[in-house]
A protein has these predicted regions:
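Active-site/ligand-binding neighborhood in enzyme catalytic cores
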Residues: 18-148, 152, 157-159
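Intrinsic-disorder/low-complexity coil detector
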Residues: 10-12, 45, 93, 191
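Mid-domain catalytic core of redox enzymes
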Residues: 135-210
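Short, charge-rich amphipathic segments
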Residues: 1-9, 44-61, 162, 167, ...
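Intrinsically disordered, low-complexity regions
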Residues: 4-7, 41, 99, 116, ...
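A broadly tuned "polar low-complexity/structure-edge" signature
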Residues: 2-4, 28, 32-34, 201
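N-terminal glycine-rich phosphate/pyrophosphate-binding loop and immediately adjacent elements
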Residues: 1-24
Length: 210
């Protein structure tokens, strides 16, 4: 994943490669040395933690990243400013102290050979699975027959809105096809700036190796 920040394309999560792209070599080396001194190497630090740093270089970097990436992207995604959200939301994409630009660090990572649609079709085709369409959760007449029921609907609706309605925000997906091998160099490009109406563009070929 990379982000379009101004005229530059920088790796996200924000890491040492991002710093080297956005700052001069001298500035980047100073910033990296202070980050390493304060936090160590190959660790992930939430942006809000960096913003509380007493180190001038670390604090200035954190403010820069917050203003140019986190604030705009959060406002576009949720229509709320970061301080209006639970801190855990911003902690999902921490700053990486080092050059690792991966979102996930699991030892084993994979994708279904024939895609998720085919995988779920085969799962639901099992003789022990009954699929009921257009059926409301509360209209199931025999829930006691099942050891476990997994509810995936709105959680406030499940509790009959006894605590009110939650402020959900929807996402609009737009799909388009271009007659070329690839349209971008990586799978996903994020667009945090307000000059773009969209938040990201994903080219799935990079992930499925079509």
């Amino acid at each position: 994943v990379i982000g379009k920040v101004g005229k530059e394309h920088i790796p996200i999560p924000f890491n040492f490669s991002s710093i080297e792209t956005m700052f001069s070599s001298k500035e980047a080396n100073i910033i990296k040395s202070h980050l390493l001194e304060e936090h160590g190497n190959e660790v992930k630090v939430p942006i809000l933690n960096l913003m509380k740093s007493k180190n001038r270089f670390v604090k200035e970097l954190a403010d820069y990243v917050y203003t140019n990436i986190f604030f705009n992207y959060t406002k576009k995604m949720w229509d709320l400013e970061p301080q209006e959200l639970d801190p855990a939301v911003l902690s999902r994409v921490p700053i990486q102290i080092g050059y690792d630009d991966r979102y996930f660090h699991d030892k084993y990572q994979s994708m279904p050979k024939y895609g998720y649609t085919k995988m779920f079709q085969k799962i639901l085709d099992h003789p022990n699975i009954e699929v009921k369409l257009r059926t409301h959760f509360k209209d199931i007449s025999n829930p006691e027959e099942f050891k476990k029921i997994i509810y995936t609907g709105p959680i406030d609706e499940y509790f009959d809105y006894r605590h009110g309605e939650l402020p959900y925000r929807s996402i609009r997906f737009e799909f388009f096809t271009e007659n070329k091998e690839y349209t971008q160099k990586v799978a996903t490009i994020n667009y945090p700036g307000f000059e773009y109406k969209h938040t990201r563009v994903t080219e799935f070929k990079h992930m499925t190796f079509q």
